[in-house]
Swiss-Prot record:
<feature type="active site" description="Charge relay system">
    <location>
        <position position="130"/>
    </location>
</feature>
<dbReference type="GO" id="GO:0046872">
    <property type="term" value="F:metal ion binding"/>
</dbReference>
<dbReference type="Pfam" id="PF01242">
    <property type="entry name" value="PTPS"/>
</dbReference>
<dbReference type="InterPro" id="IPR022469">
    <property type="entry name" value="PTPS_His_AS"/>
</dbReference>
<keyword id="KW-0597">Phosphoprotein</keyword>
<dbReference type="GO" id="GO:0005737">
    <property type="term" value="C:cytoplasm"/>
</dbReference>
<feature type="binding site">
    <location>
        <position position="46"/>
    </location>
    <ligand>
        <name>Zn(2+)</name>
    </ligand>
</feature>
<feature type="modified residue" description="Phosphothreonine">
    <location>
        <position position="161"/>
    </location>
</feature>
<keyword id="KW-0479">Metal-binding</keyword>
<feature type="active site" description="Charge relay system">
    <location>
        <position position="85"/>
    </location>
</feature>
<dbReference type="GO" id="GO:0005739">
    <property type="term" value="C:mitochondrion"/>
</dbReference>
<comment type="pathway">
    <text>Cofactor biosynthesis; tetrahydrobiopterin biosynthesis; tetrahydrobiopterin from 7,8-dihydroneopterin triphosphate: step 1/3.</text>
</comment>
<protein>
    <recommendedName>
        <fullName>6-pyruvoyl tetrahydrobiopterin synthase</fullName>
        <ecNumber>4.2.3.12</ecNumber>
    </recommendedName>
</protein>
<comment type="subunit">
    <text>Homohexamer formed of two homotrimers in a head to head fashion.</text>
</comment>
<dbReference type="InterPro" id="IPR007115">
    <property type="entry name" value="6-PTP_synth/QueD"/>
</dbReference>
<feature type="modified residue" description="Phosphoserine">
    <location>
        <position position="159"/>
    </location>
</feature>
<keyword id="KW-0862">Zinc</keyword>
C-alpha cells in the first residue's frame, strides 16, 4: 500500500486596518521606548497581506486537501468581516487588553480560522505580510516537550526517535 500524498494549499487575501502599538502593562514612557513611532497616540495603518495554509493528505475521492471554498469562506468571516477597514484596538475585542502586534494578529487569525474549519487540524500556517519587509509566520502553539507538527503529532527532539500521539 503506497503512502497517501500530502499537499499544502494556500489562499492569500489583503485587508487594511489601523492600530496603535501600546501595551497596558507598560508605562507611557516604556511603550514609547519599546514601540517607537508605532506608539503614536493616533495610530497608523497597514495594508496587510495574509496567507492561510492548510496541510494534509490529498483525498483520493475528491483530489483535494480541503475544498478551497471552505477556506475562502473562513477567511471572509474571520478576516474580511472582522478586521478589514477596522481599528484593531477599538473594533476587535481581542485587542482590548492585548497589544495589536502582527504576532498577536496572527494568533487571533489562527484561533478563529480553526473555529471555522470542519477539520481544524489541517490548518498549518498563518503568514502575515505587514510590510514588504516585515513578515510574521505562526504555526500554532508550541509544545514545550517537542517540535510542533500541525497534524496533531509531536516529534521528539532526538531525530532518531519519532513519537506520534493523537491525544495532544
Amino acid at each position: 500500500m503506497s503512502q497517501q500524498p500530502v499537499a499544502f494549499l494556500t489562499r492569500r487575501e489583503t485587508f487594511s486596518a489601523c492600530h496603535r502599538l501600546h501595551s497596558p502593562q507598560l508605562s507611557d514612557a516604556e511603550n514609547l521606548e519599546v514601540f517607537g513611532k508605532c506608539n503614536n497616540f493616533h495610530g497608523h495603518g497597514h495594508n496587510y497581506t495574509v496567507e492561510i495554509t492548510v496541510r494534509g493528505p490529498i483525498d483520493r475521492r475528491t483530489g483535494m486537501v480541503l475544498n478551497i471554498t471552505e477556506l475562502k469562506e473562513a477567511i471572509e468571516t474571520v478576516i474580511m468581516k472582522r478586521l478589514d477597514h477596522k481599528n484593531l484596538d477599538k473594533d476587535v475585542e481581542y485587542f482590548a487588553n492585548t497589544p495589536s502586534t502582527t504576532e498577536n494578529l496572527a494568533v487571533y487569525i489562527w484561533d478563529n480560522i480553526r473555529l471555522q474549519l470542519k477539520k481544524p487540524e489541517l490548518l498549518y500556517e498563518v503568514k502575515i505580510h505587514e510590510t514588504p519587509k516585515n513578515i510574521i509566520s505562526y504555526r500554532g502553539p508550541y509544545p514545550l516537550n517537542g517540535i510542533y507538527n500541525p497534524i496533531n503529532k509531536r516529534i521528539a527532539h532526538d531525530s532518531c526517535t519519532n513519537i506520534s500521539s493523537d491525544s495532544d
